[in-house]
Amino acid sequence: MLRISVRLAFLTALVVAPPAFAAMANDPQITRGKYLVTLGGCNDCHTPGYFFGNPDMSRFLGGSDVGFEIPGKGVFVGRNITPDKETGIGSWTPEQIVKAIQTGERPDGRILAPIMPWHAYAELAADDAMAIAAFLQSLNPVSNQLPRPVKPGEKISTFMFRLVPPGETSAVAAK
């Protein structure tokens, strides 16, 4: 009876906590990925509350609560990059995550928002890019439905920062 209980407990742990189990399976890669995500400042745009000085670490990388306006392009919100299958990148493979980080292309062929600095990550070593993907997949999924990107001139429903290219400050200030 005790043997059956131990087996059931073990099987339940495997089913209930797959991200934690995955993290244990390749800890050095996950650790490296966490380091690179921290160094790359991913939380800046992808963690709620970060820009207000009060990051909500229970929703770490679960998507921002701030939009970024790029004049002439619209307003974009940092997406949920946790493994939530509905609102995050939980259905993406590690290779698809790496492609998005390094080329700015999503699995469905759409291009990431212009604010995503994929150009800065285009030359990451393959091992480093895969470490980032492994770390992101090891996180607890965060369900967080975010506003869609907003076209120029459309009404927005979130706080936003306006990014102003050099030389355009006086035109934007006049608005």
Which residues does each PLM region occupy?
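The canonical Cys-X-X-Cys-His
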Residues: G33, L39-G49, I97, I132, ...
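An amphipathic alpha-helix signature
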Residues: P94-V98, Q102, A126, M130-A133
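Electrostatic cytochrome c docking/interface patches
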Residues: F21-T38, F51-N54
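Flexible coil segments in periplasmic/lumen-exposed cytochrome c-class electron-transfer proteins
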Residues: D27-P28, T47-F76, P107-K175
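Bacterial N-terminal signal peptides
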Residues: S5-P19
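Alpha-helical hairpin
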Residues: I89-W92, L124
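Second-shell loop/turn segments in exported
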Residues: P83-I89, W118-A120
